Design a protein with these regions (language model features):
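Beta-rich accessory regions
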Residues: 68-70, 272-294, 303-543
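Bacterial N-terminal signal peptides
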Residues: 17-26
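Functional cores that coordinate and move charged inorganic groups
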Residues: 241-246
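Bacterial N-terminal signal peptides that target proteins for export
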Residues: 3-17
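Short, surface-exposed beta-strand/loop micro-motifs that present aromatic residues
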Residues: 190, 298-301
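Boundary at the C-terminal end of the N-terminal hydrophobic targeting segment
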Residues: 29-31
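Beta-rich carbohydrate-recognition and catalytic domains
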Residues: 33-236, 247-293, 313-377, 414-419, ...
Length: 543
């Protein structure tokens, strides 16, 4: 095996990446000479060059490796390129379309759009869900519509939106065989329980999000009717795209999907595969702002061999004008561990104060990326003011903070902040509890990027605001992941908000804490710089 082929599958040396997106005519792209960092509100240069031809079906793995390596290296100068999130090797990424573990390695499939091949399948592999390496694109026959992957005992099943099913069993899932029988529907999720295979497919009819089919042999499929059907939780138009049905253990299941009119959602409940019905116990959202405007989009998930339920989403971006094309590329969120909150009862009733029904945490392996910690303790946050945090700055960081709001109305962090505050992103918790005792513990977690960028190419976007229910006396615990143009905020293990931000000033790296109404206290904060998972971006670490 030559050096290039060896490094292609070396998990410790994942490839750099490029997110060059196509214009509609697909004749030219804003491309390989990545734009220089914008100065103030200026626009980056976007020269047009001819697309380099590449036959994804005929070229071998070494050629794929060299092609992807070149594309990833060409993006290294892009100031908004994430250091530790997955992004594709050039061209457009859309829905994640399958996540599974096969023979000890994690595999991610995603919709990928090289020239003339819209919605083909990109493929990456990882040892830890953090460091990724590109694998050759799947055959171009595996395209046109999203789908999911599921690891069976002796093979991996992959669905695509045309109702096609593909299987593979080789170590790196490179050799795919099309199953001879198609099944009805689109946006399908497939799995097996006992002696039956099941497929859920997007529905979108009145009060119906998902339908379910059953088969013993993957050949003859019988419809079992509406799987997720509830007029209160699923309004007309909730189409159940990119759906996943995942076991939470204890007889509970988690449904993830994307609604084109409401965004990504989840349902916790009981799955009765005898009758083909899902009984909803709890319902929630993964995105609380405008759909397709810099937040989470489509999900993919699986249950790991250790029982963890893992979910990942693409971070959609439609707020950037076309002449900032280099910044518009979608990426995949950090992997999240999802579980049912054991403190929630099945029927909350009027007299029980609600809490977030789903726990959400980043995977532990992300801690391997930390370096150069800065620790602060017992910092007073002045009333109606802010306190800059000395020595805490950067564009690719993790912050872990504990804040005691005391009696303040709002507390939080300002990140990616310029010295004069012209650019800043605000993360806050509002203490707007209701007078009713069963809602008095409700708080509002927020990311506000309305002041994040001075660029006229960045369209305005309302804040992302999600509920966070706190126990009596519970402090605010934040884990904030900043990765140049994407921000993920985990709060108390029970809420997570995600947004994109595009600061233009090189000095927009500061962090401060603030309080409104009265004084608060920063109990502790640790800030780490984060290592790049892409070798050619190593020089950007710590900046």
């Amino acid at each position: 095996m030559n050096t290039l082929r060896h490094s292609f599958f070396n998990m410790k040396s994942p490839f750099p990446y490029l997110a060059i997106l196509l214009f509609a005519n697909l004749a030219t792209i804003h491309a390989d000479d990545a734009p220089s960092p914008p100065a103030n509100a200026g626009k980056p240069a976007t020269p047009e060059v001819k697309i380099e031809p590449f036959d994804f079906d005929k070229e071998d793995a070494n050629a794929h490796a060299a092609y992807f390596l070149k594309k990833r290296k060409s993006a290294a100068a892009d100031p908004y390129r994430p250091l530790y999130h997955f992004s594709p090797p050039g061209f457009g990424l859309h829905d994640p379309a399958g996540l599974c573990k096969w023979q000890g390695k994690y595999h991610l499939f995603y919709l990928y759009s090289p020239p003339g091949l819209q919605w083909s399948r990109g493929h990456a592999v990882s040892d830890d869900l953090v460091h990724w390496s590109d694998l050759p694109m799947l055959p171009t026959s595996i395209r046109l519509g999203t789908g999911q992957a599921w690891a069976d005992n002796d093979r991996v099943l992959l669905t695509i939106g045309e109702g096609k099913l593909f299987t593979a069993s080789d170590p790196l899932l490179e050799k795919w065989t099309e199953h001879p029988v198609k099944f009805p529907g689109a946006d399908n999720y497939i799995w097996r329980e006992k002696d039956h295979y099941y497929i859920t497919k997007a529905a979108g009819g009145p009060n119906t999000a998902l339908e379910i089919l059953r088969s013993r042999d993957l050949t003859k499929w019988d419809s079992m009717g509406n799987y997720l059907n509830d007029g209160y939780f699923t309004e007309p138009g909730t189409d159940g795209s990119c759906n996943n049905v995942l076991s939470l253990g204890g007889g509970q299941h988690l449904i993830l999907f994307f609604s084109h009119n409401q965004g990504p959602k989840y349902y916790i409940g009981k799955s009765d595969l005898g009758s083909g019905r899902f009984s909803i116990q709890h319902h929630g959202r993964m995105n609380y702002g405008p759909v397709m405007r810099g937040g989470l989009h489509a999900p993919t998930g699986f249950v790991d061999t250790d029982g963890r339920c893992i979910g990942m989403w693409n971070v959609m971006e439609c707020t950037i004008q076309d002449n900032m094309l280099g910044h518009k590329g979608e990426m995949i969120s950090l992997p999240r561990v999802l579980a049912a909150n054991k403190e929630v009862t099945a029927d909350e009733g009027w007299n029980i104060r609600p809490i977030n029904p789903l726990t959400i945490d980043p995977v532990e392996d992300l801690k391997k990326l930390r370096f150069n910690p800065v620790k602060l303790e017992n910092v007073t946050i002045p009333a109606n003011g802010q306190q800059p945090l000395a020595g805490v700055k950067g564009r690719a960081m993790e912050l872990e903070a504990v804040i005691d709001p005391k009696s303040a109305r709002e507390v939080g962090l300002r990140i990616l902040q310029s010295p004069n505050g012209e650019e800043q992103t605000t993360i806050s918790l509002s203490m707007h509890g209701y007078a009713w005792p069963w809602h008095s513990n409700k708080r509002e977690l927020m990311i506000d990027v309305s002041q994040a960028s001075l660029s006229p190419d960045v369209a305005s976007r309302t804040p992302e605001i999600g509920p966070l229910y706190l126990k009596d006396g519970e402090l605010l615990h934040l884990r904030v992941f900043i990765d140049r143009s994407v921000i993920e905020v985990f709060a108390n293990g029970r809420q997570c908000l995600t947004l994109r931000a595009y600061p233009t000033r090189p000095e927009s790296t500061g962090v401060s804490v603030f309080a409104r109404g009265s004084e608060a206290r920063l109990v502790s904060l640790t800030a780490w710089q984060m290592k790049s998972i892409w070798p050619e971006l190593k020089e950007q670490e710590g900046r």
